[in-house]
Amino acid sequence: MTDQELANEGAKGLVETGVEGAFDAVSRSTAGDYPSMGCSQWEGPRGNMLLGYIDGGDHFAGRSYSDIRDSGELSALSELLGSEQGQTAQLMLLSDDCLQMYMPALGKVPKFWDSRCIIYALLWCPTSHNVVRRFLQNRNDDYDLSDLAVLRDLFATQYATAADCEEYAEGYANRAENIFNYVSSLDLSAYGVAEYEG
């Protein structure tokens, strides 16, 4: 598969699994008083860029979460993000994130070539593509990273510690299993990729 095809499948997978959020998701960022939005929880400059692609989005750009909430506009922002134009903008930006940020990071992992495994890792990249890259690089010599089940087990049992967020360990274990179930069942035959045989 080409990088573009992998990026597109990664973007589609992030949307279909909902591991980062729904199209219309709006919450307060854990990093400050600004909105975290959409199916990839964009915030800050990336969030403002997303809003710039949607008619009416400029009204929300640069505003704090509390300002939007206190003015009673959270549902309006959610509706904007969930609109057809909002969904199209998110898919475009997500595909671009996968191609421009996540694929180059994963490309630095030696001997990491299996298409399903790359798609699996892409679905973790929104947590931090640099942490995912280092996580895989640090395990490259000791584990077969071209084995989807091995990747699932590594992310389920070691990623929360490696990412220094043990409080998410249970959620990450669930995410690891959900992503595995999604990626293992993908029909990638159009790209010449065989069915997963686990």
Region spans (language model):
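Cell-wall polysaccharide-cleaving catalytic domain and substrate-binding groove, primarily
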Residues: 1-108, 115-118, 122-198
